[in-house]
């Protein structure tokens, strides 16, 4: 298997071929500044985005149209990154050709008092996109396990239960 960081993406190849984590992957060996599948600069990236941006609106329209015939599919995009990593900018740029009415974007910050009254996935389930919608999560349900473990907000036994639920 080719290292995904070094692999170049062929135009007919799915992006997952360079982004999927494979057995033996070591996070510490991954360069956080890398751009798997795209080795051009910012201007070239903006051109590439402009070229495929109209497709996003078309696919969104198809997804919504499917619901008129009873379709239940939705799309969830999960962005995970450090604070100020550009997750919001990605959403603005990539979704610029989509209909905002069909986008449900959620940024998961520290849980509110109401959210703490429920199980740790309650707020995630509430934010899932409905049929025909595209959901974008700024951070994921994994963070609710990671942060609570690192900062010792919940007992170790609860962390083990949460791992079992999300895996």
Model-derived segments and spans:
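Glycine-rich phosphate-binding loop of ATP-dependent small-molecule kinases
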Residues: 1-167
């Amino acid at each position: 298997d080719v290292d995904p960081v070094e692999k170049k993406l062929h135009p007919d190849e799915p992006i997952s071929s360079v982004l999927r984590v494979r057995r033996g992957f070591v996070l510490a060996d991954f360069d956080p500044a890398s751009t798997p599948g795209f080795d051009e600069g910012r201007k070239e990236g903006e051109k590439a985005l402009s070229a495929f941006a109209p497709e996003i609106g078309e696919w969104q329209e198809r997804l919504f149209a499917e619901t008129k015939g009873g379709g239940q599919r939705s799309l969830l995009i999960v962005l995970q990154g450090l604070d100020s990593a550009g997750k919001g900018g990605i959403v603005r740029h990539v979704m610029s050709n989509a209909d905002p009415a069909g986008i449900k974007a959620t940024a998961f910050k520290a849980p509110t008092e109401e959210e703490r009254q429920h199980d740790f996935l309650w707020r995630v389930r509430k934010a899932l996109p409905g049929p025909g919608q595209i959901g974008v999560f700024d951070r994921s349900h994994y963070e609710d396990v990671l942060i609570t473990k690192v900062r010792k907000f919940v007992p170790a036994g609860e962390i083990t239960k949460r791992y079992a639920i999300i895996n």
